[in-house]
Design a protein with these regions (language model features):
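Class I S-adenosyl-L-methionine
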Residues: 1-78
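Short, surface-exposed, polar/charged, turn-prone segments marking secondary-structure boundaries
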Residues: 12-14, 31-32, 97-103, 143-144
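Generic alpha-helical structural context detector
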Residues: 70-74, 103-107, 139
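FAD-binding beta-loop-beta segment adjacent to the flavin cofactor pocket
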Residues: 77-116, 121
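A helicase ATPase "motif cassette" and its flanking acidic/Ser/Thr-rich regulatory loops
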Residues: 130
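Acidic-aromatic/histidine active-site loop/patch
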Residues: 134
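Short, hydrophobic alpha-helical segments
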Residues: 138-149
């Protein structure tokens, strides 16, 4: 949810034209990499934590996944079984998302640099906003506050 507030001014209300939603949500599969090493979740952790309880409903994805991914959370690096999204790949058959996959989910350009540790990257991506959404909102705000581009 994004809330935009404007100070009252002459002329009254601010009207925004909301775009039509997409008929189909974007799918994650096209952003998933294969053959990734170094992000694997151990078999032990998979067996005793992720799949142990009935309340755990991790989202398992792969390149053929044709559905939206769960929201990234800042605690993703802690391997949350309730909110986690994991990739069917890697040395143990299950791994965490890569930096490039996280960037794609959040709408960051592929060339965007994240010069921090993997844990910090997960925290930053989980606390981030979707770049395409903010781009549209910023454009609307600019058009409203600066009529006719002046």
């Amino acid at each position: 949810i994004y809330i935009i507030g404007y100070r009252s001014r002459k002329g009254g209300r601010v009207e925004l034209d909301w775009p039509e939603g997409k008929k189909k949500a974007a799918s994650i599969g096209r952003h998933i990499q294969t053959g990734v090493t170094g992000h694997s979740i151990s078999h032990h952790l998979q067996n005793v934590y992720i799949y142990k309880k009935d309340d755990g409903r991790p989202q398992i994805i792969d390149p053929s996944s044709d559905f939206p991914v769960k929201t990234l959370v800042a605690s993703y690096h802690k391997i949350q079984r309730l909110t986690g999204t994991f990739v069917r790949d890697g040395e143990t058959g299950l791994r965490l998302l890569t930096a490039d996959e996280c960037k794609a989910i959040m709408g960051f350009p592929k060339k965007f640099k994240i010069p921090v540790s993997r844990t910090q990257m997960y925290r930053q991506m989980g606390n981030s906003v979707a770049v395409p959404v903010i781009t549209v909102l910023a454009k609307w705000i600019a058009e409203e506050l600066i009529p006719n581009g002046k």
